[in-house]
Amino acid sequence: MTVRSLFLLPGDGIGPEAMTEVRKLIEYMNSAHNAGFTVSEGLVGGSAYDAHGVAISDADMEKALAADAILFGAVGGPKWDGVPYEHRPEAGLLRLRKDLELFANLRPAICYPALAAASSLKPELVEGLDILIVRELTGGVYFGEPKQIIDLGNGQKRGIDTQIYDTFEIERIASVAFELARSRDNRVCSMEKRNVMKSGVLWNQVVTETHAAKYKDVQLEHMLADAGGMQLVRKPKQFDVIVTDNLFGDMLSDVAAMLTGSLGMLPSASLGAPDAKTGKRKAMYEPVHGSAPDIAGKSIANPIAMIASFAMCLRYSFNMVDEATKLEAAIANVLDKGIRTADIMADGCRQVGTSDMGDAVLAEFKALSA
């Protein structure tokens, strides 16, 4: 039997409640389908700070490095607003990304048919929307040096951030995008600002060269990032996979997420490079939503983003494509039946809590897996 190791980091706020619903799915898959998941759990964020004085302990970091995949809930809350900057809850997430070398952030923007009316765009523009934004996560202006504020001595200050990309960073993120496109609609749109940024010129060149060398079967289009943002809200279904840098990816993925009408339901994945010996990638999966401390502990949080993150884990870390597809279909079926948590409640639907929503998805998944 294949052994698949999962390390769960529920975190703070609604993270633990949402993770409980994923545990139900894992337990079912192990008992009914001999999936072979081994599960361990650790602390991250504010809960780790309360227990260990840091946002993630070295011991839990070792467990994360050893796992096949990590499921991450959410971190943060007003309780920890006064902790030292280096120990703030978000530092745990940043350390995970850094130490695991997770350079590729995958942000799907999927519009479930039952929620199309909740989008800020006309339903016909977004119904059936399925975009995947591949964002470079460890380079660019967020990490480039120098990064500082200088006192110019004349009553003025100067803020400096540096956008830096090396060839290998662009090659590897482009390769991820092209490979993912092959399992989708086989189209990639690369976005940068080559008209005003030298890093954009290099980005365009390297993506073009990578495409010509290895991925000629994939359709490639280039678009300036500002034009890309406009096209996302004008005609979003023209896109399949979008690949872009850290800064533009941060912005464009949030724009795309809002097209779905359900920002709090979207998953994400962060991937590292394949291991030279095993071919496996380090990977972490997490919902896009935050810790929502205002509703934590009230059993009203929506667990769908966490469940959908587990579906991404099945697909990308364990190549359990059939199971991932069925789990995603189970979510859609539940929504089609009018079952809703408070955040997505609509007229004519039935409101349920966190556990009941998780149970409804599990029941649909069982029916599809029978």
Swiss-Prot record:
Subcellular location: Cytoplasm
Co-factor remark: Binds 1 Mg(2+) or Mn(2+) ion per subunit.
GO molecular function: 3-isopropylmalate dehydrogenase activity; magnesium ion binding; NAD binding
Keyword NAD: yes
Gene Ontology biological-process annotations: L-leucine biosynthetic process
Keyword Manganese in annotation: yes
Annotated positions for site Important for catalysis: 142, 193
Cofactor(s) of this protein: Mg(2+); Mn(2+)
Reaction(s) catalysed by this chain's protein: (2R,3S)-3-isopropylmalate + NAD(+) = 4-methyl-2-oxopentanoate + CO2 + NADH
Keyword annotations of the record: Amino-acid biosynthesis, Branched-chain amino acid biosynthesis, Cytoplasm, Leucine biosynthesis, Magnesium, Manganese, Metal-binding, NAD, Oxidoreductase
Binding residues annotated for Mg(2+), in chain numbering: 226, 250, 254
Major localization listed first in the record, in broad terms: cytoplasm
Family per record: Belongs to the isocitrate and isopropylmalate dehydrogenases family. LeuB type 1 subfamily.
Protein role: Catalyzes the oxidation of 3-carboxy-2-hydroxy-4-methylpentanoate (3-isopropylmalate) to 3-carboxy-4-methyl-2-oxopentanoate. The product decarboxylates to 4-methyl-2 oxopentanoate.
Descriptive protein name: 3-isopropylmalate dehydrogenase
Source organism: Agrobacterium fabrum (strain C58 / ATCC 33970)
Chain's gene name: leuB
